[in-house]
């Protein structure tokens, strides 16, 4: 009888393990219901007054319950000798408003510079952006609507461009081709020789916020980390938004060190996984740089017994992407690394991250570190405790297992 019971328990355990493995590979396994009111529309002030849910990494069978903290408690939670790796990318004013040669108002979102002053961009409305189409940009949405004010418009703003006196300050771009991969357009900007578009975006562009932020009063600088240095992202590495200069100083005083990588966050961050078997998902490419100084700091930290804590999923992708040869190396280029449960970690041991969208590649990445079922259980606790979700929301800290 004892052997029969043991065999039955073994079969049940094996069956449960098989079910969990199947769900790890299934898109449905990463779904959860979030009350809309928990989607943060504005950041907290000060930044480090956000809440912090602290959990231990990966299923050991005796996980301690999550601990509820405030983000400014971080120096008391981490250990001296730990190393925080941060993404120093800077969000560019990548959303521009303009008029086509027909007079129709248009909106574009810059994605990446393919060559000097030639940018891949998403366009809206997208159906009639044919090769050779000219676009005039002037001073954001308000500027483009004021342009031509007083001219009697017909057919929903479709007067020829010649009916509108050109504003004194404007940009011109020409559609070169359609990009099959994104559905966007390659635009060539007509600028004075030696001048780059990035230098002019503060004048003509606006900081793009994620589509789920619909009622924000946040200032542009609140969607930048305090250590942002390298322009190129179209979305912020949001785990870093919780840090203040004072908190960074306090961490240094506790011998909790900091190093930087760069990953320019792209539009793929907001694109859902659409294949039912997540192992078939093709990850978008993003540009990363892992400098040699950061590699040396990581090696020294590990040698001294310190822990490597990534600040955000973008740092995870940068570090792990630079270690795909088996060992972390200085790297500058693109990565399309997709991390999901079963991934063999090479560099990262702990993670600070916000709460992510259902069925997203970011949720799968975090599941690879902590386990999908444990992560969804933690999310349910966070929802019950009224944590704020997504870009302007609260954070969680996943500590390395002992």
Named regions from a protein language model:
Residues 141-153, 157-168:
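Arg/Gly-rich low-complexity intrinsically disordered repeat tracts
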Residues 2-140, 167-402:
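Surface-exposed, charge/polar-rich loops and edge strands
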């Amino acid at each position: 009888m004892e052997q029969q019971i043991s065999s039955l328990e073994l079969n049940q355990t094996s069956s449960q393990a098989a079910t969990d493995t199947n769900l790890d590979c299934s898109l449905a396994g990463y779904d959860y219901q979030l009350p809309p009111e928990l989607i943060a529309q504005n950041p907290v002030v000060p930044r480090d007054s956000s809440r912090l849910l602290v959990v231990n990494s990966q299923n050991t069978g005796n996980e301690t319950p999550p601990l509820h903290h405030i983000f400014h408690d971080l120096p008391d939670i981490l250990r001296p000798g730990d190393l925080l790796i941060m993404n120093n990318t800077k969000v560019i004013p990548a959303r521009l408003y303009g008029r086509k040669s027909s007079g129709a108002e248009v909106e574009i979102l810059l994605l990446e510079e393919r060559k000097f002053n030639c940018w891949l961009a998403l366009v809206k409305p997208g159906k009639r952006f044919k090769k050779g189409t000219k676009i005039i940009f002037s001073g954001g949405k308000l500027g483009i609507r004021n342009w031509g004010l007083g001219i009697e418009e017909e057919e929903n703003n479709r007067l020829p461009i010649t009916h509108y006196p050109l504003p004194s300050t404007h940009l011109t771009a020409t559609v070169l081709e359609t990009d099959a991969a994104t559905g966007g357009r390659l635009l060539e900007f007509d600028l004075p020789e030696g001048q780059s578009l990035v230098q002019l975006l503060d004048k003509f562009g606006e900081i793009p916020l994620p589509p789920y932020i619909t009622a924000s009063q946040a200032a542009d600088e609140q969607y930048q980390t305090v250590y942002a240095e390298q322009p190129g992202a179209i979305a912020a590495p949001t785990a870093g938004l919780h840090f203040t200069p004072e908190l960074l100083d306090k961490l240094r005083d506790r011998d909790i060190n900091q190093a930087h990588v760069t990953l320019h966050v792209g539009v793929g961050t907001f694109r859902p996984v659409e294949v039912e078997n997540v192992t078939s998902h093709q990850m978008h490419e993003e540009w990363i740089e892992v400098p040699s100084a950061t590699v040396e700091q990581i090696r020294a930290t590990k040698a001294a017994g310190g822990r490597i804590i990534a600040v955000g999923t973008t740092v995870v992708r940068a570090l792990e992407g630079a270690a795909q040869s088996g060992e972390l190396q200085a790297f500058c280029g693109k990565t399309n690394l997709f991390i999901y449960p079963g991934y063999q970690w090479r560099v990262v041991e702990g993670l600070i991250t916000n709460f992510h969208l259902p069925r997203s590649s970011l949720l799968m990445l975090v599941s690879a570190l902590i386990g999908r079922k444990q992560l969804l259980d933690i999310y349910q606790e966070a929802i019950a405790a009224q944590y704020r979700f997504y870009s302007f929301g609260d954070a969680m800290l996943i500590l390395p297992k002992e």
